[in-house]
Amino acid sequence: MKKRYLLLALAAVALVLLILGLCLWLPSNSKPHNHVYPRAAVAADALRCSEIGRDTLRDGGSAVDAAIAALLCVGLMNAHSMGIGGGLFLTIYNSTTRKAEIINAREVAPRLASASMFNSSEQSEEGGLSVAVPGEIRGYELAHQRHGRLPWARLFQPSIELASQGFPVGKGLAAALERSQDAIKRHPALCEVFCRNGNVLREGDLVTMPRLAKTYETLAVEGAQAFYNGSLTAQIVKDIQEAGGIVTAEDLNNYRAELIEQPLRISLGDAQLYAPNAPLSGPVLALILNILKGYNFSRASVETPEQKGLTYHRIVEAFRFAYAKRTLLGDPKFVNVTEVVRNMSSEFFADQLRARISDTTTHPDSYYEPEFYTPDDAGTAHLSVVSDDGSAVSATSTINLYFGSKVRSRISGILFNDEMDDFSSPNITNQFGVRPSPANFITPGKQPLSSMCPVIIVGEDGQVRMVVGASGGTQITTSTALAIIHSLWFGYDVKRAVEEPRLHNQLLPNTTTLEKGIDQAVAAALKTRHHYIQDASTFIGVVQAIVRTPSGWAAASDSRKGGEPAGY
């Protein structure tokens, strides 16, 4: 009998060991529980797009190839945020040369544009007049020419299939459709895609984009030239002008993406942060971090309610000082912002501002010395990529407000931006009585100020430490800053760094907005220090980040928009 029990026990042990062995060693298609990938990772704001980026890397593509393929997908699955009718910035790091560069494919004002062309914000937010010259495809082209490995057409194929066959409406698109349903229903060309039986689509409903699939096919075969000086150009111009716009064929013919080989760079301890300069918000992010690094934040800075409350008060005060200086920025090709940028990226200047932060109280907005105001921007999508060889791409793309100008071509399927709304107008003074910023007034060929700041952080060993960026209009810069602070200084893992409830203050309005779920000790500490507190109506920003860990690349796509990363 004892022998029988012994044999049964041995058999049971063997079975357990076999099961454990199978779990540990057999190949699995399931996603890693913690999204840590040994070789490469893609974090987009839609899972299918992360997977398309991952598959591109697996097929031998570069980080840039993966970014382009994933962005083409995001332009479908989160069409309310970005697409080929918009523009983007890419921050690219080459692990072989150990050099970072920026590709600027932001939209520009048409040649017929003028500083006084808008008498109301409605004109700049919706309709053909709000459309700036798109740059997205020229940006892809330049990035691919410099860093592509796979054929250009290969990058379009997964999204052509997706647009043709259809895909379920995701969390982010569903929320945007619900929020914008009145505008969608007002525009038959939008309702053609995003409505069913007179109502906007809901999460899980199937959406197809056959006309945009055809346009993707044309671009795949004919290249970017088809958009700017080829078979698509006349129809693009016709669509915009019939909606009241002023974009011409000459505007499209003359558009070029710009290579910037000297990105804005600041030191974060033994690491270097690379980000775009003006007219993007790299200088704003630099000033925030330079002010705060003087406090030597660490995990101990958030260990007790008292410490955490003081720490977040200091963070908000840094936001306020940085946004006051943001109003001086503009397109450096048209306005001289050299001294402004030099100050905003200077540790000495940051030290002076830090000395003005009181640990016991906030101050009226005039204390921070805003000289002008700049309009809020909105929308956007961000993705982060790290490839097998350690190269990285941080890309932020936008059509500005949800569904851009609301002008969608019923021929090409392209949804056009309303980027002209990102300029300041001399005819529109904001509700706080602060004058609009002349540095951001409209001039033909000029790019408007933007909150976008795609970031790559590199260690002194030349290896990427973090790839991060955000979407969410004026909340982009603060959301990106918080993700960096959470990860690098507080020691949070990347998922917590991205998911931690956020707060935002852009000085005007003089309000500190808090996300639901934020630590009540923080809210109480801010109230004690006389901050005017307001609960966020939805959420603050959407962040995608990848961080190097001893186990591999830890990736996080923000659940606020329903994204999920992929890798291998």
Curated annotation (Swiss-Prot):
Disulfide pairings: C49-C73, C191-C195
Modification(s) after translation: N-glycosylated on both chains. Cleaved by autocatalysis into a large and a small subunit and the autocatalytic cleavage is essential to the functional activation of the enzyme.
Signal peptide bounds: none
Residues annotated to bind L-glutamate: R106, T398, I399, N400, E419, D422, S450, S451, G473
Classification via Pfam families: G_glu_transpept
Transmembrane segments: 5-26
Matches recorded under InterPro entries: GGT_CS (IPR055262), GGT_lsub_C (IPR043138), GGT_peptidase (IPR000101), GGT_ssub (IPR043137), Ntn_hydrolases_N (IPR029055)
Keywords in alphabetical order: Acyltransferase, Cell membrane, Disulfide bond, Glutathione biosynthesis, Glycoprotein, Hydrolase, Membrane, Protease, Signal-anchor, Transferase, Transmembrane, Transmembrane helix, Zymogen
Glycosylation sites: N94, N119, N229, N296, N336, N343, N427, N510
Stretches assigned to coiled coil: none
Membrane-protein topology: Single-pass type II membrane protein
Record bears the keyword Protease: yes
Cytoplasmic side: 1-4
Reactions mediated catalytically: an N-terminal (5-L-glutamyl)-[peptide] + an alpha-amino acid = 5-L-glutamyl amino acid + an N-terminal L-alpha-aminoacyl-[peptide]; glutathione + H2O = L-cysteinylglycine + L-glutamate; an S-substituted glutathione + H2O = an S-substituted L-cysteinylglycine + L-glutamate; leukotriene C4 + H2O = leukotriene D4 + L-glutamate
Active site: T380
Subcellular location: Cell membrane
Reported regulation of activity: Activated by autocatalytic cleavage.
EC number: 3.4.19.13, 2.3.2.2, 3.4.19.14
Tissue expression notes: Highly expressed in kidney. Detected at lower levels in liver, lung, plexus choroideus and brain capillary endothelial cells.
Pathway listed: Sulfur metabolism; glutathione metabolism; Lipid metabolism; leukotriene D4 biosynthesis
One Gene Ontology MF term: leukotriene C4 gamma-glutamyl transferase activity
Subunit (UniProt): Heterodimer composed of the light and heavy chains. The active site is located in the light chain.
Family as reported in the entry's similarity comment: Belongs to the gamma-glutamyltransferase family.
Function recorded in the entry: Cleaves the gamma-glutamyl bond of extracellular glutathione (gamma-Glu-Cys-Gly), glutathione conjugates (such as maresin conjugate (13R)-S-glutathionyl-(14S)-hydroxy-(4Z,7Z,9E,11E,16Z,19Z)-docosahexaenoate, MCTR1) and other gamma-glutamyl compounds (such as leukotriene C4, LTC4). The metabolism of glutathione by GGT1 releases free glutamate and the dipeptide cysteinyl-glycine, which is hydrolyzed to cysteine and glycine by dipeptidases.
Stated name of the protein: Glutathione hydrolase 1 proenzyme
Organism (species): Sus scrofa (Pig)
Upper taxonomic lineage: Eukaryota, Metazoa, Chordata, Craniata, Vertebrata
